[in-house]
Swiss-Prot record:
GO terms classed as biological process: catecholamine metabolic process; cellular response to mechanical stimulus; cerebellar granule cell differentiation; neuron differentiation; positive regulation of cardiac muscle hypertrophy; positive regulation of cell growth; positive regulation of macromolecule biosynthetic process; positive regulation of NF-kappaB transcription factor activity
Top-level taxon in the UniProt lineage: Eukaryota
Sequence ranges of the ANK repeats: 2-30, 34-66, 67-99
Subunit description: Interacts with the heterodimer formed by CAPZA1 and CAPZB. Interacts with RELA.
InterPro entries: Ankyrin_rpt (IPR002110), Ankyrin_rpt-contain_sf (IPR036770)
Gene behind the chain: Mtpn
Keywords: Acetylation, ANK repeat, Cytoplasm, Nucleus, Phosphoprotein, Repeat
Family matches, as PANTHER family: ANKYRIN REPEAT DOMAIN-CONTAINING PROTEIN 39-RELATED, BRCA1-ASSOCIATED RING DOMAIN PROTEIN 1
Record-listed N-acetylcysteine modification sites: 2
Gene3D superfamilies linked to this entry: Ankyrin repeat-containing domain (1.25.40.20)
Organism of derivation: Rattus norvegicus (Rat)
Protein known as: Myotrophin
């Protein structure tokens, strides 16, 4: 399967395409080109429905990417409040520190995200 096409679907919110890849055997925990997992790409781009689907299919909510960034940190860094809320509700570890040594709470100035993390 082509990583670039799968990554495009993850980033652009093409849920039907993501479902098709998974139905054909795509591992939701596989490290893709670029050193990140599917959940990271969805979190980075604010793709809430895709996050929900990947988690339902067993994606590791706390898996770090090649930079030691978790999906929660990805969503926090990009300011995706709804994704942060979903990840926390599904058990994401908010104490993990990113490569800068900061937790998600310490890494954001977004007040809505801070409120979720406290």
């Amino acid at each position: 399967m082509c990583d670039k096409e799968f990554m495009w679907a993850l980033k652009n919110g093409d849920l039907d395409e993501v479902k098709d890849y998974v139905a054909k055997g795509e591992d939701v925990n596989r490290t893709l080109e670029g050193g990140r997992k599917p959940l990271h790409y969805a979190a980075d781009c604010g793709q809430l429905e895709i996050l929900e689907f990947l988690l339902l299919k067993g994606a590791d909510i706390n898996a770090p990417d090649k930079h030691h960034i978790t999906p929660l940190l990805s969503a926090v860094y990009e300011g995706h409040v709804s994704c942060v809320k979903l990840l926390l509700s599904k058990g994401a570890d908010k104490t993990v520190k990113g490569p800068d040594g900061l937790t998600a709470l310490e890494a954001t100035d977004n007040q809505a995200i801070k409120a979720l993390l406290q």
